[in-house]
Amino acid sequence: MEFVERYVNKYASADYHSCADESVTHQFKSLLTQCQRYNNKVKCNHLAKMVKKIKMANEILALLKMKVIAENKAEQWRNEKVQFREDLEKFGESLIVAASTSEEHISELEELREKVELLAKQNDLLEEKLKDCEERCRLREQEVISLESKAGYELNVPVSVCPVTEQEIKDGEQGIRPQTLPSPTLFSPQSECARQRINNTYVPTDNNIHSNSALKIQEVISLTQILGKFDTNLSPISLYNKLEAVVKQYNLGNKDACALLRAWLPYQLAAELRPPVGKHIGTLSNINENWGSTSERLRELQRILGGRDIRGTNALENARYRKGDDPMLFCTDYLSLYKVVFNCPDMLPDEPNFLYSMANKCNVDYNTRTALRYATSYNNFINTLRDWSQESFEFQRHISVAYKKKQSRRFPRKCYSCGKYGHIARFCRTSANQHDTYPIHSIQRQEGDAQENLNDYLLDHSPPSETETVVSSDNIDTGSNSAGDQKESQNEPKREFHTPPCKTGKEGTTAPPFIPWVNIPLWLYSSWSHIAMLMLMDNIAQFAQGVPNTNMPVF
């Protein structure tokens, strides 16, 4: 070993460095890399034998360095192993100690649990006893009140009104106490005489039955149902009279009357009540004098209802959301009206009572109204209402489009005047224009032909009793029976039919009539109807005999 050290000290030229914090493999790799680097730097001017010695010395030095690192690491691992073994021994000892102490703690915990259960049972028994004591105290108070009221009644009522029976006298001599009925509750039926007897005796104040005991929640709910809905449109005086009637009927004290008023009012108005109606004055709340009297209750009602805007109240009552309205605009207007009417400017729009009230003002279907009533927020309410509006609009739009498509079908019939589809000849504009431009002389010629045919038919079918000769529609002489008169009448010029002027859009223009025989005299109409009746009777008779009619006129 000494020879190796001398050899290394003589020929080695490397200087190795390593980090003790790194792992052994990393340190060994670093030493080998440094050794190779130093061997590559050996100058070539040395002899080959000298170069080999230097490289070998560097490699031996690297191996010695690795040996030292390995020994140090082995020593470190050995120390850590010893330390771990000591720690394990200490941990095992602590586990043994903890296991021994845990049994003691478990026993202590079980004892504490048993004590807690025992105390809970004792607490339940004490609560039951306390409830029994309270019930007994309440019954005794009612008995005392009934006895005092009865004693006061016996002192004030004369003997003639309530005579004492013989049985009561015997009971008094034997020392037997008379049986007293239990005190009537708040909602037990009382006769008018008994109620008047209680009101006129015992205490001079106006609330004597429930002056020491507060109303229960069920009793308050029953009284509010008796009062009915709080109508904001009524005057404060009428609302006050309704409240005081219930207060006097059930003999409520100031504290109970104020509690009933707070429960009857909407929560926005109840929050505006000031002491001593909204809250008691003084330190004790069980004393009736610390609560508001009848005049103070009336003053508070007038204050919270008198400052409200009647127009705003009417607008809030008449507010409605209908199909086609803007949901955002309706909700914004209703929110502002609600805050003004109920005097709550700091109210959040997500208030459930406000959303429920606004949902009742919407004219929507049942499912949508239910969703609006139980909306979680103001924005959710608006979105639900907007979705319903869009769905109804799309449905209406679909119906209108289908209706338009149905109405867009053309008229299937054809006009025989112009040959076009969509109308009939009666309403044809082309034929109307043709009638307007029809020549007058052709109409006169057609009228003349029709008149001649009519005259010939009347001459052939005139009745035998009449000797008249129809010559012309305007030149008829009823008294002429001779042939000369007939010739003269035939030689007279025929009367021309002049069309009356018809005002159109322009002055100076005339339109011929569509019926050429409008100017036929009335007697000719009557004769024609008589002839038509005779022909009809003749045709009916021939039809009954089975003979065809050959005398039908042909025009």
From Swiss-Prot:
Write one Pfam family the protein is assigned to: zf-CCHC
Note the InterPro entries from the entry.
Znf_CCHC, Znf_CCHC_sf
What function does the entry list?
Answer: This protein is expressed exclusively in posterior mesoderm and ectoderm of early embryos suggesting a possible role in organization of anteroposterior axis.
In residue numbers, the zinc fingers (CCHC-type) are 413-430
Q: What's in the keyword line of the UniProt record?
A: Developmental protein, DNA-binding, Metal-binding, Zinc, Zinc-finger
Describe how expression is induced or repressed: By growth factors such as FGF and TFG-beta. By Wnt-signaling and BMP-signaling.
Q: Which organism is it from?
A: Xenopus laevis (African clawed frog)
Taxonomy of origin reads: Eukaryota, Metazoa, Chordata, Craniata, Vertebrata
In which residue ranges is the amino acid composition biased (Basic and acidic residues)? 485-498
Name the record gives this protein: Posterior protein
Annotated region Disordered: where? 455-508
Q: In which tissues is it expressed?
A: Expressed ubiquitously throughout the embryo at early stages. By mid-gastrula (stage 11), expression is concentrated in the mesoderm and ectoderm surrounding the yolk plug, being strongest in posterior dorsal mesoderm. At stage 13, also expressed at a low level in the pre-cement gland. At mid to late tailbud stages, highly localized in mesoderm and ectoderm derivatives in the extreme posterior of the tail.
Q: Where is the composition biased (Polar residues)?
A: 464-484
Molecular function terms, GO-annotated: DNA binding; zinc ion binding
